[in-house]
Protein backbone atom coordinates (compact mmCIF):
# COMPACT_ATOMS: atom_id res chain seq x y z
CA UNK A 1 0.00 0.00 0.00
CA UNK A 2 1.16 3.56 -0.63
CA UNK A 3 1.61 5.08 2.81
CA UNK A 4 1.74 8.70 3.95
CA UNK A 5 3.62 9.82 7.06
CA UNK A 6 1.87 12.72 8.78
CA UNK A 7 3.77 15.36 10.78
CA UNK A 8 2.34 18.15 12.88
CA UNK A 9 4.54 20.91 14.30
CA UNK A 10 3.87 23.76 16.71
CA UNK A 11 0.70 24.77 18.51
CA UNK A 12 -1.45 25.43 15.45
CA UNK A 13 -0.12 22.39 13.57
CA UNK A 14 -0.90 20.11 16.49
CA UNK A 15 -4.37 21.54 16.96
CA UNK A 16 -5.46 21.24 13.33
CA UNK A 17 -3.53 17.97 13.00
CA UNK A 18 -5.30 16.30 15.90
CA UNK A 19 -8.63 17.63 14.61
CA UNK A 20 -7.81 16.04 11.22
CA UNK A 21 -7.24 12.67 12.92
CA UNK A 22 -10.55 12.98 14.79
CA UNK A 23 -12.42 13.62 11.56
CA UNK A 24 -10.80 10.93 9.42
CA UNK A 25 -10.90 8.33 12.23
CA UNK A 26 -14.63 8.95 12.41
CA UNK A 27 -14.96 8.58 8.61
CA UNK A 28 -13.05 5.29 8.68
CA UNK A 29 -15.03 3.93 11.63
CA UNK A 30 -12.13 3.99 14.08
CA UNK A 31 -12.82 4.82 17.72
CA UNK A 32 -10.48 6.69 20.14
CA UNK A 33 -8.90 3.41 21.24
CA UNK A 34 -7.98 2.52 17.65
CA UNK A 35 -10.60 -0.22 17.21
CA UNK A 36 -12.68 -0.49 14.04
CA UNK A 37 -16.47 -0.21 14.37
CA UNK A 38 -17.36 0.68 10.81
CA UNK A 39 -20.11 -0.45 8.48
CA UNK A 40 -18.51 -0.43 5.03
CA UNK A 41 -15.61 -2.25 3.40
CA UNK A 42 -14.67 1.03 1.72
CA UNK A 43 -13.57 2.32 5.13
CA UNK A 44 -10.82 -0.30 5.43
CA UNK A 45 -9.90 -0.61 1.77
CA UNK A 46 -7.08 1.96 1.93
CA UNK A 47 -6.79 2.35 5.69
CA UNK A 48 -3.05 1.63 5.45
CA UNK A 49 -2.41 4.97 3.79
CA UNK A 50 -2.72 6.79 7.12
CA UNK A 51 -2.80 4.04 9.76
CA UNK A 52 -0.54 1.24 10.91
CA UNK A 53 -2.29 -1.94 11.94
CA UNK A 54 -0.90 -2.91 15.34
CA UNK A 55 -1.34 -6.12 17.29
CA UNK A 56 -4.88 -6.90 18.41
CA UNK A 57 -6.35 -5.28 15.31
CA UNK A 58 -5.78 -1.74 16.58
CA UNK A 59 -5.21 1.04 14.07
CA UNK A 60 -2.52 3.58 14.97
CA UNK A 61 -2.11 6.87 13.07
CA UNK A 62 1.15 7.14 11.19
CA UNK A 63 1.67 10.53 12.83
CA UNK A 64 4.62 12.35 14.36
CA UNK A 65 3.76 15.16 16.80
CA UNK A 66 6.37 17.87 17.33
CA UNK A 67 6.56 21.00 19.46
CA UNK A 68 9.17 23.03 21.30
CA UNK A 69 7.07 23.20 24.45
CA UNK A 70 4.96 20.53 26.14
CA UNK A 71 1.69 22.47 26.53
CA UNK A 72 -0.16 21.75 23.29
CA UNK A 73 0.94 18.12 23.22
CA UNK A 74 -0.44 17.63 26.71
CA UNK A 75 -3.80 18.93 25.57
CA UNK A 76 -3.71 16.68 22.47
CA UNK A 77 -2.92 13.73 24.72
CA UNK A 78 -5.83 14.52 27.02
CA UNK A 79 -8.14 15.34 24.08
CA UNK A 80 -10.82 13.04 22.61
CA UNK A 81 -8.45 11.02 20.39
CA UNK A 82 -5.29 11.56 22.45
CA UNK A 83 -4.87 7.88 23.26
CA UNK A 84 -4.88 6.74 19.64
CA UNK A 85 -1.38 8.10 18.90
CA UNK A 86 1.76 6.10 19.48
CA UNK A 87 3.28 7.48 22.72
CA UNK A 88 6.84 7.40 21.32
CA UNK A 89 5.77 9.68 18.48
CA UNK A 90 5.35 12.72 20.74
CA UNK A 91 8.61 14.67 20.42
CA UNK A 92 8.81 17.92 22.36
CA UNK A 93 11.23 20.38 23.89
CA UNK A 94 10.78 22.54 26.97
CA UNK A 95 12.05 25.94 25.84
CA UNK A 96 9.42 27.07 23.32
CA UNK A 97 10.23 29.13 20.24
CA UNK A 98 8.60 32.33 21.45
CA UNK A 99 7.07 33.01 18.01
CA UNK A 100 10.59 33.43 16.69
CA UNK A 101 11.31 31.73 13.36
CA UNK A 102 15.06 31.78 14.04
CA UNK A 103 14.59 29.81 17.27
CA UNK A 104 12.54 27.20 15.45
CA UNK A 105 14.85 26.96 12.46
CA UNK A 106 18.36 27.57 13.77
CA UNK A 107 18.65 27.21 17.54
CA UNK A 108 16.02 25.46 19.69
CA UNK A 109 14.45 23.60 16.76
CA UNK A 110 17.79 22.47 15.39
CA UNK A 111 18.56 20.79 18.72
CA UNK A 112 15.34 18.77 18.63
CA UNK A 113 15.30 17.96 14.92
CA UNK A 114 17.42 14.81 15.09
CA UNK A 115 15.15 13.12 17.61
CA UNK A 116 12.19 13.96 15.35
CA UNK A 117 13.97 12.48 12.33
CA UNK A 118 14.59 9.27 14.31
CA UNK A 119 10.83 8.87 14.78
CA UNK A 120 10.15 9.78 11.13
CA UNK A 121 12.70 7.19 10.01
CA UNK A 122 11.05 4.57 12.20
CA UNK A 123 7.64 5.34 10.68
CA UNK A 124 9.06 5.33 7.15
CA UNK A 125 10.72 1.96 7.74
CA UNK A 126 7.38 0.52 8.81
CA UNK A 127 5.96 1.45 5.40
CA UNK A 128 5.61 -0.96 2.53
CA UNK A 129 6.05 1.72 -0.11
CA UNK A 130 6.11 5.26 1.28
CA UNK A 131 4.55 7.79 -1.12
CA UNK A 132 5.38 10.88 0.86
CA UNK A 133 4.87 13.17 3.83
CA UNK A 134 2.31 15.73 4.88
CA UNK A 135 2.93 18.46 7.44
CA UNK A 136 0.34 20.58 9.23
CA UNK A 137 1.77 23.83 10.61
CA UNK A 138 1.26 27.58 10.70
CA UNK A 139 3.55 30.13 9.11
CA UNK A 140 3.04 32.86 11.69
CA UNK A 141 4.59 31.37 14.83
CA UNK A 142 8.04 30.06 15.67
CA UNK A 143 7.88 26.27 15.84
CA UNK A 144 5.50 25.38 13.02
CA UNK A 145 7.10 27.89 10.69
CA UNK A 146 10.77 27.75 11.69
CA UNK A 147 11.11 24.16 12.81
CA UNK A 148 8.46 22.97 10.36
CA UNK A 149 10.49 24.23 7.40
CA UNK A 150 13.69 22.83 8.95
CA UNK A 151 12.02 19.40 9.13
CA UNK A 152 10.91 19.70 5.51
CA UNK A 153 14.44 20.39 4.30
CA UNK A 154 15.93 17.58 6.42
CA UNK A 155 13.31 15.10 5.18
CA UNK A 156 13.90 16.30 1.62
CA UNK A 157 17.62 15.50 2.03
CA UNK A 158 16.91 12.01 3.28
CA UNK A 159 13.95 11.15 1.02
CA UNK A 160 14.56 13.27 -2.11
CA UNK A 161 12.19 11.29 -4.34
CA UNK A 162 9.18 11.30 -1.98
CA UNK A 163 6.40 13.85 -2.24
CA UNK A 164 6.30 16.61 0.37
CA UNK A 165 2.88 18.11 0.97
CA UNK A 166 1.99 20.80 3.52
CA UNK A 167 -1.17 22.28 4.98
CA UNK A 168 0.12 25.73 5.86
CA UNK A 169 -1.92 28.21 7.88
CA UNK A 170 -1.16 31.71 6.66
CA UNK A 171 -1.34 34.56 9.21
CA UNK A 172 -3.72 37.49 9.02
CA UNK A 173 -4.02 40.73 11.02
CA UNK A 174 -7.68 39.84 11.68
CA UNK A 175 -6.67 36.80 13.75
CA UNK A 176 -3.25 37.78 14.96
CA UNK A 177 -1.21 36.38 17.82
CA UNK A 178 2.07 38.15 17.21
CA UNK A 179 3.37 41.28 15.63
CA UNK A 180 6.22 39.45 13.84
CA UNK A 181 3.94 37.11 11.84
CA UNK A 182 4.89 38.72 8.48
CA UNK A 183 8.58 38.00 9.18
CA UNK A 184 7.94 34.38 10.13
CA UNK A 185 5.61 33.84 7.17
CA UNK A 186 7.98 35.35 4.61
CA UNK A 187 10.95 33.34 5.89
CA UNK A 188 8.77 30.21 5.69
CA UNK A 189 7.47 30.83 2.17
CA UNK A 190 11.12 31.28 1.12
CA UNK A 191 11.61 27.65 2.23
CA UNK A 192 8.29 26.23 0.97
CA UNK A 193 8.87 27.53 -2.57
CA UNK A 194 12.05 25.47 -2.82
CA UNK A 195 11.28 22.39 -0.72
CA UNK A 196 7.65 21.30 -1.04
CA UNK A 197 5.76 19.70 -3.92
CA UNK A 198 2.31 20.95 -2.94
CA UNK A 199 1.19 23.45 -0.30
CA UNK A 200 -2.45 24.00 0.62
CA UNK A 201 -2.69 27.62 1.76
CA UNK A 202 -5.16 27.84 4.59
CA UNK A 203 -5.58 31.51 5.22
CA UNK A 204 -6.79 32.73 8.62
CA UNK A 205 -8.17 35.84 6.93
CA UNK A 206 -10.49 33.73 4.77
CA UNK A 207 -11.47 31.40 7.62
CA UNK A 208 -12.36 34.41 9.74
CA UNK A 209 -14.44 35.93 6.93
CA UNK A 210 -16.30 32.66 6.34
CA UNK A 211 -17.16 32.36 10.03
CA UNK A 212 -18.19 35.99 10.26
CA UNK A 213 -20.03 36.52 6.96
CA UNK A 214 -21.35 33.13 5.94
CA UNK A 215 -21.79 31.32 9.24
CA UNK A 216 -22.81 34.53 11.07
CA UNK A 217 -20.51 33.89 14.04
CA UNK A 218 -19.84 37.31 15.56
CA UNK A 219 -16.71 36.31 17.49
CA UNK A 220 -15.17 33.27 15.78
CA UNK A 221 -12.89 31.19 18.02
CA UNK A 222 -9.93 29.06 16.94
CA UNK A 223 -12.26 26.08 17.41
CA UNK A 224 -14.57 27.50 14.74
CA UNK A 225 -11.69 28.17 12.36
CA UNK A 226 -10.25 24.69 12.95
CA UNK A 227 -13.63 23.11 12.18
CA UNK A 228 -13.37 24.59 8.67
CA UNK A 229 -9.76 23.46 8.34
CA UNK A 230 -10.57 19.88 9.31
CA UNK A 231 -13.48 19.72 6.85
CA UNK A 232 -11.16 20.97 4.12
CA UNK A 233 -8.31 18.60 5.00
CA UNK A 234 -10.70 15.67 5.11
CA UNK A 235 -12.01 16.64 1.66
CA UNK A 236 -8.60 17.18 0.12
CA UNK A 237 -7.37 13.77 1.33
CA UNK A 238 -10.53 11.87 0.30
CA UNK A 239 -8.93 10.60 -2.91
CA UNK A 240 -5.92 9.38 -0.95
CA UNK A 241 -7.98 7.53 1.68
CA UNK A 242 -10.84 5.95 -0.26
CA UNK A 243 -10.71 3.80 -3.39
CA UNK A 244 -10.95 5.81 -6.61
CA UNK A 245 -9.28 6.59 -9.90
CA UNK A 246 -8.38 10.25 -9.91
CA UNK A 247 -5.54 11.87 -7.93
CA UNK A 248 -5.37 8.67 -5.91
CA UNK A 249 -1.92 9.47 -4.56
CA UNK A 250 0.13 12.56 -3.74
CA UNK A 251 2.30 12.28 -6.84
CA UNK A 252 -0.66 12.01 -9.23
CA UNK A 253 -2.22 15.03 -7.57
CA UNK A 254 1.04 16.97 -8.02
CA UNK A 255 1.34 15.95 -11.67
CA UNK A 256 -2.18 17.20 -12.38
CA UNK A 257 -1.91 20.37 -10.33
CA UNK A 258 1.63 21.78 -10.70
CA UNK A 259 2.53 23.07 -14.18
CA UNK A 260 5.73 24.80 -12.96
CA UNK A 261 7.66 23.58 -9.92
CA UNK A 262 7.59 26.84 -7.94
CA UNK A 263 3.88 27.46 -8.52
CA UNK A 264 2.57 24.81 -6.14
CA UNK A 265 0.48 26.91 -3.74
CA UNK A 266 -3.16 25.84 -3.84
CA UNK A 267 -6.37 27.53 -2.78
CA UNK A 268 -8.67 24.98 -1.12
CA UNK A 269 -12.43 25.42 -1.01
CA UNK A 270 -15.38 23.58 0.50
CA UNK A 271 -19.14 23.38 0.04
CA UNK A 272 -21.55 23.44 1.77
CA UNK A 273 -20.17 25.57 4.60
CA UNK A 274 -21.53 24.55 7.99
CA UNK A 275 -20.68 25.78 11.46
CA UNK A 276 -19.53 23.54 14.30
CA UNK A 277 -22.37 21.41 15.58
CA UNK A 278 -24.59 22.93 12.90
CA UNK A 279 -27.15 20.82 11.06
CA UNK A 280 -27.69 20.68 7.33
CA UNK A 281 -31.46 20.88 6.88
CA UNK A 282 -31.73 20.30 3.20
CA UNK A 283 -29.51 18.39 0.91
CA UNK A 284 -27.83 20.44 -1.81
CA UNK A 285 -28.07 19.61 -5.48
CA UNK A 286 -25.03 19.04 -7.68
CA UNK A 287 -25.50 22.38 -9.51
CA UNK A 288 -25.63 24.20 -6.15
CA UNK A 289 -22.51 22.42 -4.90
CA UNK A 290 -20.64 23.28 -8.08
CA UNK A 291 -21.71 26.90 -7.98
CA UNK A 292 -20.77 27.30 -4.30
CA UNK A 293 -17.47 25.51 -4.76
CA UNK A 294 -16.28 28.01 -7.39
CA UNK A 295 -17.51 30.98 -5.35
CA UNK A 296 -14.74 33.06 -3.78
CA UNK A 297 -16.74 33.17 -0.51
CA UNK A 298 -16.07 29.43 -0.14
CA UNK A 299 -12.30 29.67 -0.66
CA UNK A 300 -10.02 29.01 2.29
CA UNK A 301 -7.51 31.59 1.05
CA UNK A 302 -8.44 35.27 0.99
CA UNK A 303 -8.00 35.63 -2.77
CA UNK A 304 -10.62 36.29 -5.38
CA UNK A 305 -10.11 33.83 -8.25
CA UNK A 306 -11.80 36.35 -10.56
CA UNK A 307 -8.76 38.60 -10.10
CA UNK A 308 -6.59 35.89 -11.64
CA UNK A 309 -6.79 32.78 -13.79
CA UNK A 310 -6.80 29.11 -12.94
CA UNK A 311 -3.78 27.14 -14.11
CA UNK A 312 -5.32 23.89 -12.84
CA UNK A 313 -8.27 22.74 -10.71
CA UNK A 314 -9.20 19.51 -8.95
CA UNK A 315 -12.67 18.91 -7.56
CA UNK A 316 -13.78 16.11 -5.25
CA UNK A 317 -17.49 15.39 -4.88
CA UNK A 318 -18.60 13.21 -1.97
CA UNK A 319 -21.89 11.37 -1.49
CA UNK A 320 -24.23 9.36 -3.69
CA UNK A 321 -24.79 11.33 -6.88
CA UNK A 322 -24.88 10.91 -10.62
CA UNK A 323 -21.45 11.03 -12.26
CA UNK A 324 -23.09 12.28 -15.44
CA UNK A 325 -24.60 15.26 -13.63
CA UNK A 326 -21.28 16.07 -11.94
CA UNK A 327 -19.46 16.04 -15.28
CA UNK A 328 -22.13 18.21 -16.91
CA UNK A 329 -22.04 20.77 -14.12
CA UNK A 330 -18.24 20.96 -14.10
CA UNK A 331 -18.16 21.46 -17.88
CA UNK A 332 -20.88 24.05 -17.53
CA UNK A 333 -18.85 25.93 -14.88
CA UNK A 334 -15.82 25.97 -17.17
CA UNK A 335 -17.73 27.07 -20.25
CA UNK A 336 -19.50 29.89 -18.42
CA UNK A 337 -16.22 31.19 -16.95
CA UNK A 338 -13.78 30.21 -19.67
CA UNK A 339 -11.88 33.49 -19.37
CA UNK A 340 -10.83 32.51 -15.84
CA UNK A 341 -8.99 29.39 -17.00
CA UNK A 342 -5.70 29.66 -18.91
CA UNK A 343 -6.31 28.41 -22.44
CA UNK A 344 -2.79 27.02 -22.87
CA UNK A 345 -3.48 24.07 -20.54
CA UNK A 346 -6.38 22.14 -22.10
CA UNK A 347 -8.42 19.87 -19.79
CA UNK A 348 -7.06 21.63 -16.74
CA UNK A 349 -10.03 20.72 -14.53
CA UNK A 350 -10.19 17.22 -13.05
CA UNK A 351 -13.10 15.76 -11.09
CA UNK A 352 -13.33 12.81 -8.69
CA UNK A 353 -16.36 11.31 -6.95
CA UNK A 354 -16.31 9.35 -3.69
CA UNK A 355 -19.40 7.53 -2.37
CA UNK A 356 -18.81 8.25 1.31
CA UNK A 357 -19.91 11.76 2.34
CA UNK A 358 -18.47 13.54 5.39
CA UNK A 359 -20.35 13.05 8.67
CA UNK A 360 -23.60 14.96 8.90
CA UNK A 361 -23.85 15.74 5.18
CA UNK A 362 -25.56 13.92 2.31
CA UNK A 363 -23.28 15.53 -0.25
CA UNK A 364 -20.25 17.77 -0.15
CA UNK A 365 -17.61 19.06 -2.54
CA UNK A 366 -14.00 20.03 -2.05
CA UNK A 367 -12.15 22.33 -4.38
CA UNK A 368 -8.40 22.60 -5.02
CA UNK A 369 -7.38 25.48 -7.25
CA UNK A 370 -3.98 26.51 -8.53
CA UNK A 371 -4.86 30.09 -9.36
CA UNK A 372 -2.65 33.06 -10.16
CA UNK A 373 -4.87 35.03 -7.75
CA UNK A 374 -2.90 33.49 -4.87
CA UNK A 375 -0.44 36.32 -5.51
CA UNK A 376 -2.85 38.55 -3.54
CA UNK A 377 -2.05 36.54 -0.43
CA UNK A 378 1.72 36.81 -0.95
CA UNK A 379 1.42 40.53 -1.71
CA UNK A 380 -0.47 41.08 1.53
CA UNK A 381 2.28 39.42 3.58
CA UNK A 382 5.00 41.10 1.57
CA UNK A 383 3.58 44.58 2.25
CA UNK A 384 3.43 43.91 5.99
CA UNK A 385 6.96 42.48 5.89
CA UNK A 386 8.37 45.49 4.07
CA UNK A 387 6.69 47.99 6.39
CA UNK A 388 8.57 46.55 9.38
CA UNK A 389 11.76 45.52 7.62
CA UNK A 390 12.56 48.96 6.21
CA UNK A 391 12.63 50.22 9.80
CA UNK A 392 14.45 47.04 10.92
CA UNK A 393 11.77 46.65 13.60
CA UNK A 394 12.08 43.57 15.83
CA UNK A 395 15.10 42.33 13.86
CA UNK A 396 17.28 41.97 16.95
CA UNK A 397 15.21 38.96 18.05
CA UNK A 398 16.34 37.17 14.89
CA UNK A 399 19.92 38.40 14.62
CA UNK A 400 20.32 37.48 18.29
CA UNK A 401 19.76 33.85 17.27
CA UNK A 402 22.53 34.13 14.69
CA UNK A 403 20.52 35.14 11.64
CA UNK A 404 21.82 37.60 9.08
CA UNK A 405 19.83 40.49 7.62
CA UNK A 406 20.79 39.13 4.23
CA UNK A 407 18.47 36.17 4.76
CA UNK A 408 15.54 38.54 5.24
CA UNK A 409 16.40 40.37 2.03
CA UNK A 410 16.65 37.08 0.12
CA UNK A 411 13.33 35.83 1.48
CA UNK A 412 11.67 39.12 0.56
CA UNK A 413 12.94 39.03 -3.02
CA UNK A 414 12.10 35.34 -3.44
CA UNK A 415 8.50 36.06 -2.45
CA UNK A 416 8.36 39.04 -4.82
CA UNK A 417 9.71 36.83 -7.61
CA UNK A 418 6.96 34.32 -6.87
CA UNK A 419 4.35 37.07 -7.24
CA UNK A 420 5.83 38.10 -10.62
CA UNK A 421 5.88 34.50 -11.83
CA UNK A 422 2.17 34.13 -11.08
CA UNK A 423 1.54 37.43 -12.86
CA UNK A 424 3.56 36.32 -15.90
CA UNK A 425 1.43 33.20 -16.39
CA UNK A 426 -1.76 35.13 -15.72
CA UNK A 427 -0.95 37.39 -18.67
CA UNK A 428 0.35 34.63 -20.95
CA UNK A 429 -1.79 33.55 -23.90
CA UNK A 430 -1.56 30.39 -25.98
CA UNK A 431 0.01 32.23 -28.93
CA UNK A 432 2.63 34.42 -27.31
CA UNK A 433 4.00 31.65 -25.10
CA UNK A 434 5.92 30.31 -28.12
CA UNK A 435 7.32 33.74 -28.98
CA UNK A 436 8.85 34.12 -25.50
CA UNK A 437 10.79 30.91 -26.04
CA UNK A 438 12.27 32.07 -29.35
CA UNK A 439 13.25 35.50 -28.05
CA UNK A 440 14.97 33.87 -25.09
CA UNK A 441 16.99 31.53 -27.29
CA UNK A 442 17.96 34.37 -29.61
CA UNK A 443 19.32 36.46 -26.73
CA UNK A 444 21.36 33.53 -25.42
CA UNK A 445 22.94 33.07 -28.83
CA UNK A 446 23.83 36.77 -29.16
UniProtKB/Swiss-Prot annotation:
Q: Where is the composition biased (Acidic residues)?
A: 429-446
Its GO biological process annotations read:
microtubule-based process
Q: What compartments host this protein? A: Cytoplasm, Cytoskeleton
Query: Cross-referenced SUPFAM superfamilies, in alphabetical order?
Result: Tubulin C-terminal domain-like, Tubulin nucleotide-binding domain-like
Name the segments for region: Disordered: 426-446
Pfam families linked to this entry: Tubulin, Tubulin_C
* Residues the record lists as binding GTP: 11, 69, 138, 142-144, 204, 226
- Motif MREI motif: positions: 1-4
Q: What is this protein called?
A: Tubulin beta-1 chain
Query: Source species, please?
Result: Notothenia neglecta (Yellowbelly rockcod)
Q: Which gene encodes it?
A: tubb1
Amino acid sequence: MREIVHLQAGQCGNQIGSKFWEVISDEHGIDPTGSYHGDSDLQLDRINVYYNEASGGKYVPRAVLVDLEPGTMDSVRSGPFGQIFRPDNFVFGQSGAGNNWAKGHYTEGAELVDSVLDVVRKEAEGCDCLQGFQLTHSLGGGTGSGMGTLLISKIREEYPDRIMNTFSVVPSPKVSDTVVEPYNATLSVHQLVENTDETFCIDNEALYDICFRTLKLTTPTYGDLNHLVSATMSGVTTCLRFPGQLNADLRKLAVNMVPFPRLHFFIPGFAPLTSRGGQQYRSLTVPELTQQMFDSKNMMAACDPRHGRYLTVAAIFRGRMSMKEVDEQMLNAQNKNSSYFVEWIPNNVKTAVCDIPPRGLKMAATFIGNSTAIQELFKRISEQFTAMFRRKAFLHWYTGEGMDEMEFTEAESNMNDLVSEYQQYQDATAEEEGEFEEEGEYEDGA
